[in-house]
């Protein structure tokens, strides 16, 4: 299983006693040591910045589907345990803490406690292959985490405006209204889903 800037199941990586043979066409010009070092660096960067810039090809989707199948124990299941995804990352050299892994789940919108134990294929694909505008999304989410002490995935309207009133160059009232429009909130909304906001903002930036 291989994706650009994401987790790859290599020849001897095992999940629940099963083995998956990865495709190595992107690294044929590298020797084994260089390939492993490059892959590990990309994997680490991918989880610290879980989104990458680039199209998702049919081959990548197929490889992700293969990995999802392996994690399902060889059965066609709709969901796989998120703990197995975490174990896979540990097996391929991504030594993430559980907190870092759960932060990655929050990035893809899995902020509700009842949704955190399982991932659908679309969630799995999203976790591994999303786009990003360099460091902006991570830095912005980190700023929201300061207000979201209990990791709910939401901030209040007041916290949202306070953040952008003090972040970098202060936003004007007009700019704040535009940001609230991106967040798709009106005057009656007090809670803002900041993951959804960052995703929408990043999508618009990437389309520029």
From Swiss-Prot:
Region (Disordered): 1-34
CDD domains referenced in this protein's UniProt entry, alphabetically: EFh
A GO term, aspect molecular function: calcium ion binding
Annotated residues for binding of Ca(2+) 2: 148, 152, 154
GO cellular component terms attached to this protein's record: myosin II complex
Gene3D superfamilies to which the protein is assigned, alphabetical: EF-hand
The keyword GTP-binding is annotated on this UniProt entry: no
This protein's record includes keyword DNA damage: no
Keywords, ordered alphabetically: Calcium, Metal-binding, Repeat
Positions bound to Ca(2+) 1: 118, 123
Limits of the EF-hand domain: 64-98, 99-134, 135-170, 171-206
Domain notes per entry: This protein has four EF-hand domains, two of which may be functional calcium-binding sites.
Protein name (database record): EF-hand protein 5 variant 1
Organism: Trypanosoma cruzi
Upper classification of the organism: Eukaryota, Discoba, Euglenozoa, Kinetoplastea, Metakinetoplastina
